[in-house]
Every structure is written in structure tokens, then in C-alpha cells.
């Protein structure tokens, strides 16, 4: 006899269960000899697919259930347990869950629409009808109970979880004949052991935002029970046990996996194969005409026809047409589309359709890396859009294909070690002092298990029982979903209504959102498309618009020359601040040494600049400039690896090596590459045997083929997707081109993008200064909500470029206030003077906002001192209330006294987060000159220099030898850099070191782990 558990609530009943749907759970069920069990989460089905597959993997029959909170007609809670008897019932459960998530309140009448194929259990302790029965209100009970008779299979669920449960069962048994009841045994599970009960209560506290949780519904009995315990518990009621098996036998859902359920492009086009072919051929002709490459038409057609044949055989014609359609719509509506992403640019068909912007033949890209008949997977065409236009494209797709066929995808924020400990500390009221010390250690580990061997960790928790308990709880809740959110890019599309494949819930911007995660949806064969919002595309778009507006020049970034000498000179100088993919300090250092002069060079650097391959960069550079000879493991590798100086840089090279040495098709070679990259021993050995055998057929001896195979295995993880490297290098190049030829517009937009980062602001302002462009403080008459470029006359009367700091960048001046100020300025003209400003903005700004506008320099144009404007603001405000009578009042006298320099500097720093006009170091200009001090931005690697700076932060540590040393953050008002003082030097100067004091430091700049730092040799305080 088996008690089939029909009431397991998983971790996906968020913050109400610690039952994890993982392999450990599957093992527990298997060890208990369980043949069937059910998931029954509340209102949602987030975990249904995971549960289904987990059960199948352990030879357990999965029963898909759903607990629904129903609208009550009396004063009792009203819950019902529903189970899918067949696939129709499964779809109906998804519809009911969608309805519950969308409409919040579900009535019994709503159930009737979706009762087919569904079995219903009324749990005695949770059903309103059952509570009416137990209260002796039989007339009311009968009225409610009869409503559920729409279900062919209707049961009363009886449990023994709590006191007085036997008497409840006897009460129901006594009226069994009268009401023709069918009963079934229930045992609710929300945690797996007594140890997990505390974790369960903790999750309830998090959910309820409380520091304590008192069980009121017999929760202390909701733990998992083994079969022998359940059989013993229900031994007096064998019919309740038998009924669980009876229900299990009635529930037979078989979910289909692996078969694609792709949407149709259009019902009006009957022959999508021909339509796609014609579009591609037309697009190819247009591409070749523009590039002057018509002589190679036959070669391109051969490749195109080969690709289209594979696309058609695999049933993806509609997929390509759908992507083509929304890309075409985007371009037609002035939305910049990225040149490509991932492996999609490897397809000539994508290039012909305008989906991507690079010629795969020109760059030797392999279609099989993207799609092949040997690898039965969905093609993955990810598309990049400006982050402020992405939603417009999704809205178009939504409107074109329908609300029930397009949806966002759910994703879950799960507990990591830090998040778990923080929530536990908050609930348990553990002082920050203690938990923060623990978090400092945990911060470097991905799980509690990984950190348990750390000596400091062990000592800390052994010294503090509260921390020890917190860690114990954290281990239990780690990995459990804490909240649901929306996938950053993914959108799901189907031909039929989505609710036939996945339960839904409300999503963003009027779209639905799937309850199933992306991994579950892909297993179901549903089409996921990634619409990525890229800030860099927004910047490019905005720069182009500004150039058009100010210079009347129209730029198409997809038509700019890709061999512009000046652009590559800028890149080779490492002046790539703000350039996508190339802006980090370490990358800029590599660029200055490698000096790329074409797109492929940029792709090489892009591919190599990652942990692992980065180690090969010095040798790569030496080989490029002929300072080191290129060597090959075998002469036959030369034609494949010569372009990359004998180094495997790209995944495609691994595929070509497998083709060359073992006769693999490129599709087979890609499968090999994917297999060996996982480094599983049994896979490696199996693939080695196959590779060596195939290699022998081509005449290579086993010693050579084994060496080549080892070579492939070594670099399988290092290799980068060539098409992705090329397209993202082109995107970076496009930004570099704009920076080279339209510097002021580029920098103004980069500054607008990075306004929330003071460090970036300092870096960009410093860069502009080097190019002769001054960044001016905000101006109430010329600044807007972004950085704006203007022409202004300098002291010599020459017109120069300047960039105004935006009003939105002033602290305490919010977006709504800026909007209202700009509307006032637009409607009624520039502000004439201080009194005009106060009068016209008195309903927009208060004294605090006005003060920060003054501190920032935004009102300097009025010719008054900042101190006078702050002091006289309220008097001017009061005067403005007199309207036309104010002319009869005495004129306001404005004193000429100004704040001291240090005050001005501090006020400006408070208002803007940095100094633009009143850099505190300006007063030390003579000192800077005397000691020949350099700005931080002027420091050269390994060159000893003097720096005039402030110590922003100072932290001392002790070495293993118990010697003191210090780490610092240094600033010169424009840039910041880390500093380090080693023990010997620190002993000599430590008595003069203090935060927020100004010093002349002597030291040399070094680059370690991609970060610059100054090794300080001496210091004196000013």
C-alpha cells in the first residue's frame, strides 16, 4: 500500500515553503519507494515543469496540481485543490492559474469554465464549504458543496495534521451516506524536516515583513513524512490511503518536449520557403551592388542556397521572417538596430534580410556555428536596440501577433549567501556590526558551503551563537526563490495562445508574462527571442541626431568607412574612454601596444581580453610585430591559425581544425567543440577515440591526432565566438569613429549617460579639457536635462566649444523641477536677472532648491555673488508677491561680499558631487608649479612623478609579518586613482597622513590586475 502525497507545496509558493525541486528531493522520494506524487502550489504553477521533469528523472509519476484561493461567501478562508487528469485538464489548470494571477479573485463560477479534465479536492481544514459542515450549518454547506459538483471527480480531503483531527474525520464519516461523500487522505508538505521548520517560519517573516511568526494553522505539522509514518498515521482509515492511489491513477498528464511550437509569420503567405528565398536573393543583390561585389554573385548564391536549404529543412522559415519583419519595421521607424549579436551574423541569410550588418563571407564566419542539421537546436538571433526604444519594438510585435501570442518571461531572484544572511539578520535582529563582519568574509564565496572551511568564518560563527544560527538557516534557504521579476531581454512567441503551453500573469507595458522560466519554455519548444536594450546604441543614436541638428550632416553608422585612419589612430592611442568594449584601463593599455588597424584586429583583442586567453596577449603582440617567430603544433594548422599568429582565438578555428584533421563536417565539429568544452572525463575520452579514428582515415598517425585533440581540448574554453567578436568590434569602432570626428557631441552624450557616476564625470571632463573643450557649470538659461554643446567666446575673443553641465545633475533638483523650469524658460524666454528668476519660479522651486542652484553656479549669469543670492532669496521672494506694486518698494541692495574660496569649493562639491569651477587645488597652483606636479590623468606607467592631491580615503592593514601598510584613494579634483604605501615608507610618513588633507606625493604609476595604482615613495602635507 502507498500513500500518494497530493499536497506538496514547493519553493515556488514563494516565501511559504523550503521544499526545493532539486535532485536531493528526487532522491528522498525514490528512497521512500514513492511511485506518484503531486505538486500543489498556491495560485501559481511556476515550478510545474521542473517538478514534472524531476519526477520523470526518478521514475516517479508526476501529478500536476494547483491550489486556488477562491472568493468566500461567508467568513471562512476558501481554498480548493485542483489536479489535471489529462492534458485538457493541464491546460485548464494553466488557464485558471493565469486567471487567478490576472484577476486576483477567483469565484466558484469561474471554475466551471475550466472544469473539464480537472479533479477537485476540498481540503477539510481550508475549504469554506467544509468549515460550514463542521460548524453544523448543513443547509449552507449543501448550497456551497453542490456548486462543486461540476467536477466529475470531487473529494473531501481529510488530514491528521493537528489536534482534534480524528473527530473531524468521524464527523464527515457520519454523514458520508447522506451527502454521498468521496474522501481522500491529505498531508500538506511545506518543509522537509523539523530542522527546516525554523527556516519556513523565517520565510514567512520575510513575506509578512515581521520579526516573528506564530503558527496559527497547524504549520508545525506541515513537515514531510516518510511512507511508513503516513501509513501508520492513517492506519485507522485505509480507504483514505487507497483513495490517494485512486486519484493518482486518474491523473495522466503527458507533457510534450522537444517539438518546436513556432509562430507563423503570416497566414496570408502560403509558401514561406519561396517568400524567404525571394527576399534573401533580392537583399543579396542589393548588398552586392552597394559593395561593388557583383562579380562574386555565384559564390554568394551558392552559400545562400545552402543556408536556406538548412533553414527550410529545420522548419525555421517563419522564424527568420518574423525577425526580418520587426527589424525592417524598426529601421523604417527610425530606430537604430545593432549590427548583430552572438552567432547570428554568421548567417548570410541574416545579412541579406538586413537582420545583421556584416558580410559573413568577408570575415570567414561559419554558418554551422549558428545553425546546423547535426545540432537540433533553435537558431538564436538576438537583436540589439537602443535601450530607450526597445519597448517600442516589443510593442510592435505585440500588436502584430496578438496579446495572447507574445509575452515577457519570468525569472526568479533566488537567495544567495549574502541575501539570505541579510534577511535572517533583519528578522532575528542581529546587530549590523556582527552580520557585516560575516558578510565581508562571505562576499568572496558563491555559497555557504564554499566558505565553511574558511578559518576566519569558523572563528567568527563559533564566537557568536546568533551568527551560527544564521548560517544554519542560510544554508537551508540558499537557492530558494525570494521574488519574481522579468527576464531582461527575453520575449516568448507562439502560433496558438500562450496559455495552452504556459500559465501567464501580468507583465510590463501591458504584456503578459509567462510563469515558466526561459529554460522550461525552451524545453517545451517555444520560441524565445531576445530584444536587448543597449545603452551604447542610444548614445550613438543621440550623437547622430545632435550632429544632424547642429551641423546638418546625416550619418548612417552602417555606411561609415571601416578603415578610417584617424579612428584607428585614436584607438591605438588608447583614447577609448566611453567606447563600447574598449574602455577599461587594461584594454586601453593593450590597444596602445597592439595598435590595431582593421576590424579583425579589434576582434582579436576583443576575444583575447578575457580571463585565460589574456595570458596570451603579450606573445600575440610580439608575434604581430615580428619580435617573436610564430610556431605551429603541425604545419597543417598554418592556414587556419596564421591570421592569429598561431594562437587559437575563435571557436570557429577549433571547428576548422576538427574538419581539417579528422574530416568532421562543420556541424559535427561544432558539436565536438561544445562537448569537450564541458571538460567531462567520459565525454573527453569518448570524443578522443572518435577523433583519432577519423583522423587516421585521413592519414594522420595516432601520435599527431592525439596531440591535435589535446590542443583542441586545451583551447575549447578559451575560444570566443568570432561573429560576436566582429560585430561588437564594429559597434565599438562606430563609437570611436564618432568620437574621432564629432568629439564634442560624442562626449556630451557620454557625459549625459554617465551623469550618475562622479568618477566618470571627472574622467570625461578631464578628457574634454585635453581636447580644448571646457565644461562649464550649469546655467539657468542654457542648461537643460542633459549636457549641451555651445560656442562661446574666450577671453581672447575667439569662439571655442564648451559643454554646459545639466540642471538635472544638481543635487536636490529633481527631474520634475527641471522639466518645469525648462517649460517656463521655453514659454516665457530667458531669465533676465535674479529677481525675474525668483518671480517666475516661485511655484516651482523652494529655498533649498534655489540654494543648490546657486551653489552649483547655475545663477552666476546674473552677475551677483553666490552669497548675496543665497542671503537675499527670501527678500526677493517676498517682494515678488507684491506684483505690480513692487516697483513702489525700495530697490534691493545686493552686497558684493562672496564666500571664501574653500566655502565656494565645498558648496559646489555639495551641489554637483565634483568641482568644476572651484577646484580646491586651484589655490595651490603655485605649489603645483614649484614641485612640477602632474595631474593624475598625466601620469605615465612606471614613471616617477610628483602629484598634488587630496587623500580621499585611507585604510591601513597589517601584513603577514605584522607590518603596517596603507591603501589610499587619491583625487586631484578631476580624476581619482588608488595609491599604496608599503611598510618601509609607511613607517616614515604615517604620522602626517590624514583623510581630506592636501599633499604633494612622490610615486610611480603601476597597472596591476587591470587597475592603476600609485606606489607612493614620499609625502608632505600642505
Per-segment meaning from a language model:
Residues 80, 197-277:
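Active-site or pore-adjacent capping/gating segments
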Residues 62, 66, 82-87, 181, ...:
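Acidic, His- and aromatic-enriched active-site or binding-groove loops in soluble protein domains
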Amino acid at each position: 500500500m502507498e500513500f500518494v502525497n497530493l499536497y506538496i507545496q514547493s519553493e515556488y509558493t514563494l516565501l511559504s515553503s523550503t521544499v526545493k525541486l532539486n535532485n536531493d528531493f528526487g532522491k528522498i522520494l525514490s528512497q521512500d519507494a514513492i511511485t506518484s506524487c503531486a505538486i500543489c502550489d498556491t495560485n501559481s504553477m511556476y515550478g510545474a515543469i521542473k517538478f514534472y521533469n524531476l519526477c520523470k528523472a526518478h521514475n516517479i509519476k508526476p501529478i500536476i496540481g494547483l491550489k486556488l484561493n477562491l472568493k468566500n461567501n461567508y467568513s471562512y478562508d476558501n481554498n480548493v485543490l485542483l489536479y489535471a487528469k489529462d492534458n485538457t485538464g493541464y491546460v485548464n489548470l494553466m488557464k485558471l492559474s493565469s486567471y487567478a494571477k490576472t484577476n486576483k479573485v477567483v469565484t466558484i463560477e469561474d471554475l466551471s469554465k475550466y472544469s473539464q479534465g480537472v479533479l477537485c479536492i476540498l481540503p477539510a481544514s481550508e475549504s469554506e464549504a467544509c468549515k460550514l459542515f463542521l460548524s453544523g450549518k448543513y443547509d449552507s454547506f449543501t448550497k456551497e458543496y453542490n456548486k462543486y459538483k461540476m467536477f466529475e471527480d470531487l473529494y473531501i480531503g481529510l488530514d491528521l495534521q493537528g489536534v482534534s483531527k480524528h473527530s473531524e474525520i468521524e464527523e464527515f464519516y457520519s454523514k458520508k451516506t447522506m451527502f454521498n461523500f468521496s474522501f481522500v487522505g491529505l498531508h500538506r508538505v511545506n518543509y522537509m524536516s523539523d530542522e527546516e521548520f525554523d527556516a519556513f517560519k523565517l520565510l514567512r517573516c520575510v513575506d509578512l515583513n515581521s520579526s516573528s511568526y506564530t503558527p496559527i494553522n497547524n504549520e508545525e505539522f506541515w513537515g514531510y513524512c516518510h511512507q511508513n509514518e503516513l501509513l501508520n498515521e492513517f492506519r485507522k482509515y485505509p480507504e483514505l490511503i487507497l483513495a490517494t492511489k485512486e486519484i493518482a491513477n486518474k491523473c495522466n498528464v503527458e507533457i510534450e518536449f522537444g517539438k518546436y511550437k513556432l509562430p507563423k509569420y503570416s497566414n496570408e503567405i502560403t509558401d514561406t520557403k519561396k517568400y524567404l528565398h525571394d527576399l534573401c536573393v533580392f537583399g543579396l543583390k542589393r548588398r552586392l551592388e552597394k559593395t561593388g561585389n557583383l562579380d562574386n554573385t555565384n559564390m554568394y548564391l551558392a552559400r545562400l542556397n545552402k543556408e536556406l536549404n538548412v533553414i527550410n529543412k529545420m522548419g525555421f522559415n517563419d522564424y527568420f521572417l518574423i525577425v526580418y519583419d520587426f527589424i525592417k519595421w524598426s529601421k523604417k521607424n527610425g530606430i537604430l538596430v545593432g549590427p548583430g549579436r552572438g552567432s547570428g551574423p554568421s548567417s548570410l541569410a541574416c545579412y541579406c534580410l538586413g537582420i545583421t550588418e556584416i558580410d559573413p563571407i568577408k570575415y570567414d564566419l561559419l554558418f554551422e556555428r549558428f545553425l546546423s542539421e547535426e545540432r537540433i537546436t533553435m537558431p538564436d538571433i538576438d537583436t540589439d536596440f537602443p535601450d530607450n526604444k526597445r519597448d517600442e519594438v516589443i510593442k510592435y510585435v505585440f500588436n502584430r501577433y496578438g496579446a495572447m501570442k507574445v509575452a515577457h518571461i519570468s525569472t526568479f531572484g533566488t537567495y544567495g549567501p549574502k541575501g539570505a544572511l541579510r534577511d535572517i539578520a533583519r528578522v532575528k535582529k542581529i546587530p549590523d556590526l556582527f552580520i557585516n563582519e560575516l558578510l565581508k568574509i562571505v562576499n568572496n564565496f558563491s555559497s555557504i558551503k564554499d566558505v565553511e572551511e574558511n578559518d576566519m568564518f569558523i572563528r567568527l560563527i563559533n564566537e557568536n551563537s546568533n551568527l551560527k544560527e544564521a548560517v544554519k538557516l542560510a544554508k537551508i534557504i540558499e537557492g530558494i526563490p525570494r521574488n519574481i521579476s522579468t527576464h531582461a531581454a527575453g520575449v516568448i512567441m507562439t502560433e496558438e495562445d500562450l496559455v495552452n503551453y504556459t500559465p501567464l500573469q501580468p507583465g510590463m507595458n501591458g504584456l503578459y508574462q509567462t510563469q515558466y522560466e526561459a529554460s522550461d519554455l525552451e524545453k517545451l519548444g517555444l520560441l524565445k527571442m531576445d530584444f536587448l536594450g543597449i545603452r551604447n546604441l542610444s548614445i550613438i543614436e543621440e550623437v547622430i541626431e545632435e550632429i544632424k541638428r547642429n551641423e546638418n550632416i546625416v550619418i548612417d553608422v552602417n555606411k561609415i568607412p571601416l578603415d578610417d585612419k584617424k579612428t584607428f589612430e585614436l584607438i591605438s592611442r588608447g583614447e577609448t574612454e566611453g567606447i563600447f568594449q574598449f574602455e577599461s584601463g587594461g584594454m586601453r593599455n593593450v590597444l596602445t601596444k597592439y595598435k590595431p588597424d582593421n576590424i579583425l584586429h579589434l576582434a582579436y583583442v576583443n576575444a583575447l581580453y578575457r580571463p585565460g586567453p589574456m595570458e596570451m596577449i603579450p606573445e600575440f603582440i610580439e608575434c604581430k610585430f615580428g619580435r617573436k617567430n610564430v610556431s605551429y603544433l603541425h604545419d597543417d594548422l598554418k592556414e587556419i591559425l596564421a591570421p592569429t599568429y598561431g594562437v587559437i582565438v575563435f571557436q570557429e578555428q577549433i571547428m576548422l581544425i576538427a574538419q581539417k584533421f579528422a574530416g568532421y563536417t562543420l556541424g559535427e565539429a561544432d558539436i565536438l567543440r561544445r562537448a569537450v568544452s564541458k571538460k567531462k572525463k567520459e565525454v573527453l575520452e569518448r570524443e578522443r577515440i572518435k577523433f583519432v579514428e577519423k583522423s587516421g582515415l585521413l592519414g594522420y598517425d595516432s601520435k599527431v591526432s592525439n596531440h591535435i585533440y589535446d590542443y583542441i581540448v586545451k583551447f575549447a574554453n578559451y575560444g570566443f565566438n568570432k561573429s560576436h567578436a566582429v560585430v561588437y568590434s564594429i559597434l565599438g569602432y562606430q563609437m570611436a569613429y564618432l568620437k574621432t570626428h564629432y568629439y564634442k557631441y560624442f562626449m556630451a552624450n557620454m557625459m549625459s549617460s554617465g551623469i550618475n557616476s562622479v568618477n566618470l564625470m571627472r574622467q570625461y571632463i578631464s578628457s574634454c579639457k585635453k581636447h580644448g573643450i571646457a565644461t562649464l557649470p550649469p546655467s539657468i538659461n542654457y542648461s537643460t536635462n542633459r549636457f549641451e554643446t555651445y560656442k562661446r567666446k574666450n577671453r581672447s575673443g575667439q569662439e571655442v566649444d564648451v559643454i554646459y553641465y545639466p540642471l538635472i545633475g544638481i543635487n536636490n533638483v529633481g527631474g520634475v523641477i527641471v522639466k518645469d523650469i525648462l517649460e517656463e524658460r521655453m514659454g516665457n524666454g530667458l531669465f533676465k536677472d535674479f529677481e525675474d528668476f525668483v518671480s517666475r519660479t516661485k511655484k516651482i522651486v523652494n529655498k533649498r532648491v534655489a540654494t543648490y542652484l546657486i551653489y552649483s553656479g547655475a545663477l552666476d549669469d546674473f552677475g551677483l555673488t553666490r552669497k548675496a543670492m543665497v542671503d537675499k532669496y527670501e527678500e526677493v521672494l517676498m517682494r515678488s508677491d507684491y506684483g505690480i506694486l513692487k516697483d513702489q518698494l525700495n530697490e534691493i541692495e545686493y552686497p558684493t561680499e562672496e564666500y571664501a574660496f574653500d566655502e565656494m569649493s565645498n558648496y559646489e562639491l555639495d551641489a554637483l558631487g565634483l568641482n568644476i569651477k572651484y577646484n580646491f587645488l586651484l589655490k595651490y597652483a603655485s605649489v603645483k608649479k614649484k614641485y612640477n606636479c602632474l595631474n593624475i590623468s598625466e601620469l605615465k606607467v612606471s614613471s616617477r612623478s610628483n602629484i598634488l592631491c587630496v587623500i580621499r580615503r585611507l585604510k591601513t592593514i597589517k601584513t603577514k609579518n605584522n607590518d603596517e601598510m596603507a591603501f589610499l584613494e587619491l583625487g586631484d579634483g578631476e580624476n581619482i586613482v588608488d595609491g599604496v604605501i608599503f611598510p618601509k615608507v609607511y613607517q616614515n610618513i604615517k604620522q602626517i597622513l590624514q583623510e581630506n588633507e592636501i599633499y604633494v606625493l612622490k610615486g610611480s604609476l603601476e597597472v596591476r590586475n587591470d587597475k592603476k595604482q600609485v606606489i607612493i615613495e614620499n609625502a608632505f602635507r600642505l
